UniProtKB/Swiss-Prot annotation:
Designated name of the protein: Argininosuccinate lyase
Gene that specifies this protein: argH
Family: Belongs to the lyase 1 family. Argininosuccinate lyase subfamily.
Claim: Transport is one of the keywords in the record: no
Subcellular location field: Cytoplasm
Amino acid sequence: MALWGGRFQGETSALFKLFNDSLPVDYRLFEQDVVGSIAWADAIASVGIITATECSDLKKALNELLVEVKGDPAIILASGAEDIHSFVESALIAKVGDLGKKLHTGRSRNDQVATDLKLWCQSEGAALVARLQTLRSELIALAEREFDAVMPGYTHLQRAQPVTFGHWCLAYVEMIERDLSRLTDALKRANTCPLGSGALAGTAYQMDRHALAAALNFASPTLNSLDSVSDRDHVVELCSTASISMMHLSRMAEDLIFFNSGEAGFISLSDEVTSGSSLMPQKKNPDALELIRGKTGRVYGSLVGILTTMKALPLAYNKDMQEDKEGLFDVVDSWAICLDMAALVLSGLVVNRPNALLAAQQGYANATELADYLVSKGMPFREAHHVVGVAVVAAIAKKIPLEGFTLAEFKTFADIIEDDVYPNLTIEACLAKRDVLGGTALAQVKQAIAAKNAG
C-alpha cells in the first residue's frame, strides 16, 4: 500500500507506478533508512509519542530487518514497494503490526531521504578517502622505486626538458592530495542532520534535534527546515570533487598510455591490467587506463545532470530531486573502481630506463642548458635564447645533438663559448641544476619523497 493513498480514489496507472517508483535506485539506502528509523524511534519516545517498551520493540524489529536483508538483499526489490522508505515501513508493520504505523509520526519522507542520503555520502565518502590514500601511497612507492629514472618532460606533447620519473609521480601525488582535501571539506559540510525538519516547516514535536544528530553521528543538526529538505549541495559537491579527481586520473592515464606506447616505450604495464586483440595476436592494450579515461566523461555527465536538475527548483522539496541518486551512485561507483584500478596499474608498472633515457637525450632537451650557459657568460637571456635557436636549427641539419658540435663550431654561434660548455649539456647536469624546491634534481626528489612519507 502506498504511504499517501488516503487522498486518492482512483487507481494508480501501472505506467505511472513504473515511472514514479524509485526502489530500483534507492534500495541502496536501506541500511541508512533503518539506522535513521532507529534514531527516530528514540526521538519520538523522548517526547512521549511511544512508550519505552514500544520503542524497544520497534528497534528490535528494525535490527532484525537489517539482519534479514543483509542475508537476502533480493527481498527489497522483490517487494514491489514504491521506494526504500515504503519497503522498510511495510516490513516493520508486518513484524509489529499497528505499532509500526506509529514510527513515521512527525517525520516526512522529505527529511527522511535527505538524512539517508547524507548518511550514505558520509559512509561512501570515508571509503573514498581510504581509496585516495591508497593511490597516494602507490604513487609515492613508485616514485621511490623509480626516483632516478630519467625521461623527457613534455610541453605541447613535445620533448622539452629532462625530468625524473619520480618527479612525474610526485606531480600526481600533489593532485591526489588536493582531491583528498576537497573530499574531506565536502564531507565536513555535509555533516549536518536534516532529520526533524519534517516536510518543510519542521516537526511539530519538541524533540532535541542536537541529540538526534549526535545519535546518527552527525556533527550538528541543520538550522533551517526549508533548506534541510531541499538541499542537495552535498550531492553536487561530491560529484564535483569526483569530477576533478577523475580529471586527474584521466590525465595520469593519458600520460601512461603514451609512455606505454610503441612510439615511446618508457614503461611496461603488468599483464593483469592489460588485454589483447581478438584479431591481432601481438597486441597488449592498456585497457585499464583507457577505461579510466573513458569513465571520466560519464562522471562529468552526472555532475552536469544534478546541477541542471537543481538549477530552477523552488523551495522546498520537488519530485525532480528523486533524480539526485542514480547519477550520484554511478559517480561514486565509477570513481571508486577507477581509484582502485589506478592503484593496481601503478603497483605493477616498470620503467624501461634505457628507452626513457634515450628519449630524454634526444629532441634537444638540453637547449635551455646551453642558453643558461650563455647567460652565465654574460649574455642577456633573450639574446641567448635566439643564439641557441639558431644552433638547434644547425644541429638538426647536421643530424647531431648540441653536444656534438666541436668547440670551433660552437664559436660560430657565440664566441664566448668555451670547453666548459660540454659538462653543462649532459643529462646529469640538466637535472642537477634544477636543485630548487619543487625541482626535478635527484636531491629534491628524494627530499620530496621523504616529506610525503613523513606526511
